[in-house]
Amino acid sequence: ALPILSETPGSNIVITNYDRLHRFDPEAFSGVVLDESSCIKHHDSKTLKLLLQAFEQTQFKLCATATPAPNDWTELGTHAQFLGVCTQAEMLAEYFTHDGGDTSVWRLKGHARELFWTWVSQWGAMVRKPSDLGFDDSAYLLPNLHMHEHTVKTEMPLNGMLFAAEAQTLSERRDARRMSVEDRVKDCASIVNSEASEPWVVWCDLNAEGDALTKAINGAVQIAGADSHEVKEQRLADFAAGKFRVLVSKPSICGFGLNWQHSARMAFVGVTDSFESYYQAVRRCWRFGQKRDVHIHVFASSAEGAVVANLKRKERDATAMAESLSAETRDAVMQSVTGTTRQTNTYNAAKSVVVPSFLKAAA
């Protein structure tokens, strides 16, 4: 934990990680803020259960995240539950229905759409840019984001297959990644080493990928899960300060909450189905304060086509969700956040319209 102490008793502010919650007495705090609160999106997650139990009686609560529901709208329910608005089960019963015969799939009721977003806007706000609150975006516009896809040809068939084919199941996708580690690392290292003056962030998914990348890329330093908190903290600080050029790590370790605007190059050598991890990882460099165009390189084997396609689908769905929430709740959000609403003038005709004779004839 990183405590910021005050001389006034009872007014201390403490900043800490979720995994250190057990070291604190929740009753000693009058307010709690969950940053990167998407960690509570799963209704059965251990983190959500611990936080619900710890801060049930806390007076002031705030959740902040760019991806509150990276998979579907029902995940908004866990945020409502933590904030004390209602339980996720109550939200589902009120606004959602089972979609067909699959009882695990929930669909927003057609007649409840407007009511649902109005309800969400009473306790949540989707603010992506100043114009969402009625302000000018000119000082907030990000530089261009360039995506480069690199496909490694895979000739070796997956287990049980006669010919090489695109992986479909999760186990097949992991097998495909393992079989193409050497080729993907080689292609990535070639590009990273060719830009010796550019700081790079290189993301991996498997330990074997991280180890191989660190060896193949000149000056690369890896942050692994097995490293101590002290080692991770020091290496993160060193990379941000420019003490080494290339950082290799997993999105699950370094993909959230960090600011690396000094880097405009990024590579994904391990691609998973998690759009949230991908989105958050990209945003470490492509964020407010970035002055240059950002280039993202994605390395995947030809057998991982289903993974890349699924990631793109989730990106489209997430964009559509953000657009819908912003459009549906804009007026309510402006009222609750800025105290203003959109003003319109209604025209009430004082005289009846006289239709010209030639229009009557045409009709």
Language model: regions and residue ranges:
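Conserved helix/coil segment N-terminal to the catalytic DExD/H
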Residues: 7-31
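Conserved helicase ATPase core of P-loop NTP-dependent helicases/translocases
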Residues: 201-203, 211-212, 218-254
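Conserved P-loop NTPase motor "coupling/switch" region that bridges the ATPase
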Residues: 9-10, 31, 39-42, 48-132, ...
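A conserved SF2-helicase RecA2
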Residues: 273-362
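Conserved interdomain hinge at the start of the Helicase C-terminal
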Residues: 172, 177-205
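A short beta-strand element within the Helicase C-terminal
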Residues: 28-33, 75-78, 258-271, 294-298
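Interdomain helical connector at the RecA1-RecA2 junction of SF1/SF2 helicase-like NTPases
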Residues: 92, 100-176
